[in-house]
A protein has these predicted regions:
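Conserved beta-strand/loop subsegment of P-loop NTPase cores
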Residues: 70-76, 97-109, 129-135
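Beta-strand/loop nucleic-acid-binding surfaces
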Residues: 22-37
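Helix-rich effector regions associated with P-loop NTPase G domains
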Residues: 35-40, 47-49, 56-60, 64-65, ...
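Histidine-anchored nucleotide/phosphate-binding helix
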Residues: 86-97
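Canonical P-loop GTPase G-domain recognition
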Residues: 111-163
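Structural detector for short beta-strands of small beta-barrel domains
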Residues: 1-10
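Short aromatic-glycine-enriched beta-strand elements
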Residues: 12-16
Length: 329
């Protein structure tokens, strides 16, 4: 029995790295019956092209679904597309929910001479304890520092489409991932990364390239839980007059009293996330039972299915015959 790590998943095939080799495997039928979800980053035991066991995880995240990671690097563009603070705060809050160390990287610095944006970034996020770096994958600016934060860790790179994740990976890895320009019509990037995939930088450093996504919502938490995702709000959380204060229209709200010390854009993001969480509250009210883990249990439903027509012809013939016995066991 061999042990290895899933570095890529495509359709029903799982690509496992073990002792310097790559193995294409399928999931043993008994694991399918148990409805065990296997993620990129999972360590597994496998034999004869079949995954027999999923080993315990130290952590995992969803949207994107990745296991056994050390840190999240949030990539934003200074320009093209323009920096969106609400999108940035969304990623930060999501990483906070998963209790992961978070680094903020602002790419495409060569496209903007707006010092006010840079000053605003440092003013908001440096007091919150974030490591912040500015890069230009095109000009090589900040790449050495970017590479240094990845050393000895498994890092998930996340961010909206078009911010330059693939270009940064190309700059530090020497590989050549496909990149595309931001659309002039929409001002948004296109999805050059289609699936989560682990990329080795060296023996101890790996990055997880993830698809750009814009549909991340806080529709899996109750509104009262949202303020716990904002570090600067936590000291004032218990000082409001009302225990169930949402910090919106209530009187004697300690958090509203500190707007200014709490950045306005951060507070606006908080309000947006509370509105999204109200959808979950309505669902809980309708069902009558609060399910704390509903997000983790149902995230499979948001997975995008790969069209059967996209499969290589070999997978419709030879490989399906090879793995038929595995599926039936």
């Amino acid at each position: 029995m061999k042990q290895g790590q899933i570095f890529k998943i495509h359709s029903d095939f799982y690509y496992v790295q073990s002792e310097g080799e790559t193995f294409e495997c399928k999931l043993r039928h008994v694991l399918k019956k148990q409805k065990q979800k296997i993620l990129v980053g999972d360590y597994v035991e496998f034999k004869d092209g079949a995954i027999e066991k999923i080993l315990p995880r130290k952590n995992y995240i969803t949207r994107p679904s990745v296991a056994n990671i050390d840190q999240v690097v949030i990539i934003s563009a200074v320009k093209e597309p323009d920096l969106s603070f609400i999108q940035l705060n969304r990623y930060i809050a999501f990483a906070k929910y998963h209790n992961l160390n978070t680094i903020l990287c602002f790419n495409k610095n060569d496209l903007s001479n707006d010092d006010k944006t840079i000053e605003k970034v440092f003013k908001i996020y440096e007091p919150l304890g974030f490591d912040i770096l500015f890069t230009s994958a095109l000009e090589g600016y900040g790449i050495e520092e970017f590479n240094s934060i990845l050393q000895g860790k498994t890092s998930v790179l996340c961010g909206a489409s078009g911010v330059g994740k693939s270009s940064l990976i190309n700059a530090v890895s020497g590989i050549n991932l496909r990149t595309k320009e931001v659309s002039d019509k929409t001002g948004r990037g296109t999805h050059t990364t289609r699936h989560c995939e682990i990329i080795d930088l060296d023996n101890s450093s790996r990055i997880v390239d993830t698809p750009g996504f814009s549909n991340l919502k806080f529709d899996f938490l109750l509104p009262l839980d949202i303020d716990t995702l904002f570090t600067e709000m936590i000291p004032y959380k218990g000082l409001c007059k009302y225990q169930d204060c949402l910090h919106i229209n209530e009187t004697d709200c300690a958090i509203k009293a500190h707007i200014g010390e709490i950045d306005e854009t951060r507070y606006e993001s908080y309000l947006a996330f509370v509105e999204e969480a109200k959808e979950y509250k309505e669902k809980v009210k309708y069902q009558g039972v609060k399910t704390e883990t509903s997000h983790k249990q149902t995230h499979d439903k948001v997975a995008v299915k790969i069209s059967l027509r996209k499969r290589q012809s070999a997978r419709n013939t030879l490989k399906q015959n090879i793995y038929k016995d595995i599926d039936n066991e």
